[in-house]
Regions:
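N-terminal helix-cap/turn-to-beta initiation motif at the start of protein domains
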Residues: 25-38
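Structural motif
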Residues: 39, 62, 134-136
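Positively charged n-region of N-terminal signal peptides that target proteins for export
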Residues: 1-4
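Short aromatic-glycine motifs in intrinsically disordered, low-complexity regions
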Residues: 85-91, 138-145
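Edge beta-strand at a domain terminus
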Residues: 25, 134-136, 142-158
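Central antiparallel beta-sheet cores of small beta-barrel/beta-sandwich binding domains
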Residues: 42-126
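Short polar/acidic secondary-structure junctions
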Residues: 32, 45-47, 118, 129-131, ...
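Bacterial N-terminal signal peptides
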Residues: 7-17
Length: 158
């Protein structure tokens, strides 16, 4: 049985054109220099419209992000604030509000971070992953385990 398994592994490597230790052609691997650092469009979960531009920066080897611009803000509210936030973020202006922090690189994703949802003021655990050659960011916010959460996709501003 073990002999058959070894033969199957060797045949798979030969057919893929890879040698042991290589990534098979077409496999997803993010280049080391490609990171989420930059500007991202965020979207409303219900309408699908762009809501803000978030800038992600590297801070002491970790990633963090803040709202840089609101898209189509309420014209009656000239300085929207995070009214549902708690702690240091309570009542702070949305523009400049830190909504991502403490993300550390783990192979092809950034994990262990936190994300603030300014709509409800809650902080969630967060993992992010680059997709589509760095043009799309998968943002997963969750409580406890990653399966208990929701995913948003942000698009890189080019």
């Amino acid at each position: 049985m073990l002999y058959r398994l070894i033969n199957l592994c060797v045949a798979t490597l030969l057919l893929s054109g890879s040698t042991p230790g290589q990534i098979a052609p077409g496999a997803s691997q993010i280049p080391a220099e490609l990171t989420p650092v930059g500007h991202w469009r965020t979207f409303d979960d219900v309408t699908g419209k762009v809501t803000s531009i978030v800038v992600i920066r590297e801070e002491n080897g970790k990633l963090g992000g803040e709202i840089e611009k609101l898209v189509d803000p309420d014209p009656a509210d000239h300085n929207p604030r995070c009214l549902r936030c708690e702690g240091d973020a309570k009542g702070k202006p949305l523009i400049g509000l830190r909504i991502l922090w403490n993300l550390r690189r783990d192979t092809d994703q950034w994990t262990g971070g936190r994300i603030l949802d300014p709509d409800n003021g809650k902080v969630y655990r967060c993992d992010i992953t680059l997709e589509d050659r760095g043009r799309r960011l998968r943002v997963r916010g969750f409580i406890g385990f990653s399966v208990l959460g929701r995913t948003q996709y942000w698009l890189r501003v080019e």
